[in-house]
């Protein structure tokens, strides 16, 4: 038995192929989910990948949030299905109300494309259980609107509830409190700006650190 991981594609998505490859590399069966799909085809987990869904018109993730497939993703997440949003996918999850806060223009207003070091701040999620506490990960970051912001009250709640999942070592985009990724209250929904699906082989690298997220999802699905 293995997990069936759905990978969503919107018009303008760029990283669905990479996310699918990462899921296959850990032994999952990949199911392609189109933005117009009205069901999730029996998947056990969902990845909402990066790119520029619908051209990022209005604002990043604002239109994708209303795609039919997202109604199903939200409903499945409410039932406890593991969901991972990467970069634009993180923006979509925030727009959909699955995660609090928002992603805004980077400090300096420049698109950032570089490898960054992250610290795993929580291993109590469906997507980080395979990591050691405070593990360091080297993964690519590529975004123009990657600065995480939220009201102070929300930030305090995230900190107090252990829902900050990843932090930047070198905060290149100005995210409040160095936050690179957060999770839902039950730890089943995770969003992060850097790209673990681009860090699955040391040869094409920068590392294979990103595989830990996908192995963690397998554990979450297979062990419940």
UniProtKB/Swiss-Prot annotation:
Cellular component, GO, one term: plasma membrane
Active site annotation, chain numbering: 87, 195, 197
Reaction(s) catalysed (UniProt annotation): N(2)-formyl-N(1)-(5-phospho-beta-D-ribosyl)glycinamide + L-glutamine + ATP + H2O = 2-formamido-N(1)-(5-O-phospho-beta-D-ribosyl)acetamidine + L-glutamate + ADP + phosphate + H(+); L-glutamine + H2O = L-glutamate + NH4(+)
EC number annotated for this UniProt entry: 6.3.5.3, 3.5.1.2
SUPFAM superfamilies: Class I glutamine amidotransferase-like (SSF52317)
The entry's keywords: ATP-binding, Cytoplasm, Glutamine amidotransferase, Hydrolase, Ligase, Nucleotide-binding, Purine biosynthesis
Glutamine amidotransferase type-1 domain residues: 4-224
Predominant location category: cytoplasm
Localization of this protein: Cytoplasm
Source species, domain of life: Bacteria
PROSITE patterns in the cross-refs: GATASE_TYPE_1
Biological process annotations from GO: 'de novo' IMP biosynthetic process
Record-level Gene Ontology MF annotations: ATP binding; glutaminase activity; phosphoribosylformylglycinamidine synthase activity
Pathway listed: Purine metabolism; IMP biosynthesis via de novo pathway; 5-amino-1-(5-phospho-D-ribosyl)imidazole from N(2)-formyl-N(1)-(5-phospho-D-ribosyl)glycinamide: step 1/2
Function: Part of the phosphoribosylformylglycinamidine synthase complex involved in the purines biosynthetic pathway. Catalyzes the ATP-dependent conversion of formylglycinamide ribonucleotide (FGAR) and glutamine to yield formylglycinamidine ribonucleotide (FGAM) and glutamate. The FGAM synthase complex is composed of three subunits. PurQ produces an ammonia molecule by converting glutamine to glutamate. PurL transfers the ammonia molecule to FGAR to form FGAM in an ATP-dependent manner.
Description of how the protein assembles with itself and partners: Part of the FGAM synthase complex composed of 1 PurL, 1 PurQ and 2 PurS subunits.
Protein name: Phosphoribosylformylglycinamidine synthase subunit PurQ
Lineage of the organism: Bacteria, Bacillati, Actinomycetota, Actinomycetes, Mycobacteriales
């Amino acid at each position: 038995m293995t997990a069936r991981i759905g990978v969503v594609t919107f018009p303008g998505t760029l990283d669905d192929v990479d996310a699918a490859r990462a899921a296959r590399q850990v032994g999952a069966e990949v199911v392609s989910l189109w933005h117009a799909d009205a069901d999730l085809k029996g998947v056990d987990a969902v990845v909402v990948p990066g790119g520029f869904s619908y051209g990022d018109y209005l604002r990043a993730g604002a239109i994708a949030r209303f795609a039919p497939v997202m109604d199903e993703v939200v409903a499945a997440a409410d039932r406890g299905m593991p969901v991972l949003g990467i970069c634009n996918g993180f923006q979509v999850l925030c727009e959909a109300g699955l995660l609090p806060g928002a992603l805004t223009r980077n400090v300096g207003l420049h698109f950032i494309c570089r490898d960054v070091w992250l610290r795993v701040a929580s291993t109590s999620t469906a997507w980080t259980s395979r990591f050691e506490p405070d593990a360091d990960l080297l993964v690519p970051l590529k975004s123009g609107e990657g600065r995480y912001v939220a009201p102070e009250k929300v930030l305090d709640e995230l900190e107090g509830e252990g829902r900050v999942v990843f932090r930047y070592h070198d905060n290149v985009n100005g995210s409040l409190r160095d936050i690179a990724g957060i999770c839902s209250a039950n730890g089943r929904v995770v969003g992060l700006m850097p790209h673990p699906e681009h860090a699955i082989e040391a040869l094409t690298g920068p590392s294979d650190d990103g595989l830990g997220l996908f192995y963690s999802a397998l554990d979450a699905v297979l062990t419940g």
